[in-house]
């Protein structure tokens, strides 16, 4: 079974195209018009081994908010679509990712219940052309689009770039494990209620 999805999300604010393969090799092509954001998505795809093409044309003349939010929603929807009925997936996972002095942890449940618990903070308002407050919003929007419960925490760190990168790498590693097929589940949906 191929776990591939394509999403096209178009509004008056953005035009988002996503094509992904959950069972890829970490190949990606990301073009959002926001350099630092592209760098974070590069980390996500490389370390999750998800193949993904992302193209976003957004109203950057206003600010990056809509571009980041709509990209996260569409990417989440693509993950959810590619997972199908979620039969046989591992479902739960967590991962730590260090980036020099920064260490972050992400725990994930592919539950169908979108929720974000966020414990990370930044000491500067921008990283390149990205408002740091948008990082929490990206994780929330991604969780909503994908139907994930995410617990995201930076345990420590000083450099804001390193903190952000450790967050996306931790998500990548946790997502890679959670979407993996567990042969021991013999194709069953990993829930006592029979659906996710």
Curated annotation (Swiss-Prot):
<keyword id="KW-0456">Lyase</keyword>
<dbReference type="InterPro" id="IPR000807">
    <property type="entry name" value="ImidazoleglycerolP_deHydtase"/>
</dbReference>
<keyword id="KW-0368">Histidine biosynthesis</keyword>
<protein>
    <recommendedName>
        <fullName>Imidazoleglycerol-phosphate dehydratase</fullName>
        <ecNumber>4.2.1.19</ecNumber>
    </recommendedName>
</protein>
<dbReference type="InterPro" id="IPR020568">
    <property type="entry name" value="Ribosomal_Su5_D2-typ_SF"/>
</dbReference>
<dbReference type="GO" id="GO:0005737">
    <property type="term" value="C:cytoplasm"/>
</dbReference>
<dbReference type="GO" id="GO:0000105">
    <property type="term" value="P:L-histidine biosynthetic process"/>
</dbReference>
<dbReference type="InterPro" id="IPR038494">
    <property type="entry name" value="IGPD_sf"/>
</dbReference>
<keyword id="KW-0028">Amino-acid biosynthesis</keyword>
<keyword id="KW-0963">Cytoplasm</keyword>
<dbReference type="GO" id="GO:0004424">
    <property type="term" value="F:imidazoleglycerol-phosphate dehydratase activity"/>
</dbReference>
<comment type="pathway">
    <text>Amino-acid biosynthesis; L-histidine biosynthesis; L-histidine from 5-phospho-alpha-D-ribose 1-diphosphate: step 6/9.</text>
</comment>
<dbReference type="InterPro" id="IPR020565">
    <property type="entry name" value="ImidazoleglycerP_deHydtase_CS"/>
</dbReference>
<comment type="similarity">
    <text>Belongs to the imidazoleglycerol-phosphate dehydratase family.</text>
</comment>
<dbReference type="Pfam" id="PF00475">
    <property type="entry name" value="IGPD"/>
</dbReference>
